[in-house]
């Protein structure tokens, strides 16, 4: 994959030089390579780190890293194998943002293309736009040689079908009399409860996604977020992942932030942009993340709160500052995020607003 165009590099260099006196953070000393990601992105961070160490642009590196997860049929929240919309059709969203040029690209409701982050990268490099959606995004992907395929794996199809069969006792769909395969049963045990003795389910729709941010030795930053979105969503629903300022944001003079979890809560607060702005004002990555979680908790509508008044959904943020400091935060419970740097690759714990 080629680097960012020479024109963009020259433009970014000119902007950086012009603003050096106005923002001392832009002219900090060279640091170390670091790549962070959501908990499902450990291999993505390893791959990204390796490519940056070999001299690739951080944006190319993170897009190549998340492709590992987009290819994984066992990750039901991203790419090939992602859970479909309510009609059984897989729709993917992704965005990329390049720190040095401050350019971004995104696609939403994209069908039949397993690497939406790569398509988003083409939007950044080969168009004057930021976001393409639906049929237009697919036409653009075809024009750039991306291969179309059915993204609905057998595992995802069985999960979708069981969801549809168990959704209501008032329709004509009946659950199969024999238990599903072990993987499907495990999925439903984790994400649902049985209502009475009806066999019907009260289902908590999982919201996965992968976010990945990177910084190189020159302290240039980039990031990407890619997802299959909320499971069994209304066709055409778009979450936070492809929205710049929500699913991800980077300011090369300050830092980056990205999110996984309930996209609607993020969209209503433009959380990634807000987190970076808090860092601009002096907050650490963890302080910025915790403040964003508090804002989301404060604005959550009553139907989405538990008996104690707390948000009953999950949402996580992965934040990195220009100086290399980083943090992962989560609304509640336990969550991890992936890190690869000179100390190696590892999962670290996110700090929870509600432990």
Question: For each predicted feature, which ranges?
Answer:
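Broad, structure-driven detector of short, well-ordered beta-strand segments within folded domains
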Residues: 338-340
């Amino acid at each position: 994959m080629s680097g960012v165009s020479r024109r963009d590099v020259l433009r970014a260099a000119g902007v950086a030089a012009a603003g050096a006196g106005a923002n001392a953070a832009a002219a900090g000393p060279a640091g170390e390579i670091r790549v962070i990601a959501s908990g499902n992105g450990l291999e993505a961070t390893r791959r990204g780190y390796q490519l940056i160490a070999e001299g690739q642009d951080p944006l190319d590196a993170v897009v190549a890293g998340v492709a590992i997860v987009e290819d994984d049929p066992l990750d039901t929240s991203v790419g090939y194998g992602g859970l479909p919309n309510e009609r059984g059709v897989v729709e993917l969203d992704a965005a990329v943002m390049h720190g040095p040029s401050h350019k971004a690209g995104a696609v939403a409701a994209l069908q039949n293309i397993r690497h939406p982050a790569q398509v988003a990268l083409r939007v950044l490099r080969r168009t004057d736009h930021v976001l393409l959606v639906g049929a237009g995004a697919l036409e653009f992907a075809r024009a750039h040689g991306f291969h179309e395929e059915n993204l609905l794996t057998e595992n995802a199809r069985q999960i979708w079908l069981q969801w549809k069969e168990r959704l209501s006792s008032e329709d004509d769909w009946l659950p199969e009399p024999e238990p599903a395969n072990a993987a499907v049963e495990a999925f439903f045990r984790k994400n649902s409860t049985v209502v009475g003795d009806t066999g019907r389910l009260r289902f908590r729709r999982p919201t996965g996604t992968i976010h990945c941010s990177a910084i190189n030795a020159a302290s240039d930053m980039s990031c990407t977020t890619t997802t299959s979105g909320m499971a069994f969503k209304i066709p055409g629903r778009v979450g936070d992942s492809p929205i710049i300022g929500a699913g991800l944001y980077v300011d090369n003079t300050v830092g980056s932030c990205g999110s996984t979890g309930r996209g609607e809560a993020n969209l209503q607060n433009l959380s990634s942009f807000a987190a970076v702005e808090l860092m601009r004002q002096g907050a650490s990555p963890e302080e910025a993340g915790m403040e964003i979680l508090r804002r989301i908790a404060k604005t959550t509508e009553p139907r989405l709160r538990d008996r104690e008044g707390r948000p009953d959904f999950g949402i996580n943020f992965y934040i990195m500052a220009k100086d290399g400091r980083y943090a992962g935060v989560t609304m509640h419970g336990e969550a991890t995020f992936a890190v690869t740097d000179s100390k190696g690759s590892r999962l670290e714990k996110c700090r929870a607003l509600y432990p």
